[in-house]
Amino acid sequence: MIKTTLLFFATALCEIIGCFLPWLWLKRNASIWLLLPAGISLALFVWLLTLHPAASGRVYAAYGGVYVCTALMWLRVVDGVKLTLYDWTGPLIALCGMLIIVVGWGRT
């Protein structure tokens, strides 16, 4: 379970970085060269998704819960936005859903 969760967090980080770098280029006039590491990060994101031992739809559904948490950590650390009660409650609910799906992997 811990290995799966850590893999999901690494996957989410790759996806967020892969999307954030082009965002910097488009919104903040950063260097176009950021598209190169963005592409690499997104390719790594896709590869990491293939490492999970479950059907792709289950992986994507469970991954969504961890993605929400990772995105909010990004919001706090990178964007510097203070998290609200709602920002904490939403991921808690999402992680409960992720946990139900992952626990069920071995039972189907």
From Swiss-Prot:
Membrane topology, Periplasmic segments: 1-5, 52-60, 106-108
Keywords, comma-separated and alphabetical: Cell inner membrane, Cell membrane, Membrane, Transmembrane, Transmembrane helix
InterPro entries registered for this protein in UniProt: UPF0060
Record-linked Pfam families: UPF0060
SUPFAM superfamilies in alphabetical order: Multidrug resistance efflux transporter EmrE (SSF103481)
GO cellular component: plasma membrane
Membrane topology, from the record: Multi-pass membrane protein
Transmembrane segments: 6-26, 31-51, 61-81, 85-105
Localization: Cell inner membrane
Ranges per topology, Cytoplasmic: 27-30, 82-84
HAMAP family listed in its UniProt record: UPF0060 (MF_00010)
Record-stated family: Belongs to the UPF0060 family.
Protein name in UniProt: UPF0060 membrane protein YnfA
Organism: Escherichia coli O157:H7
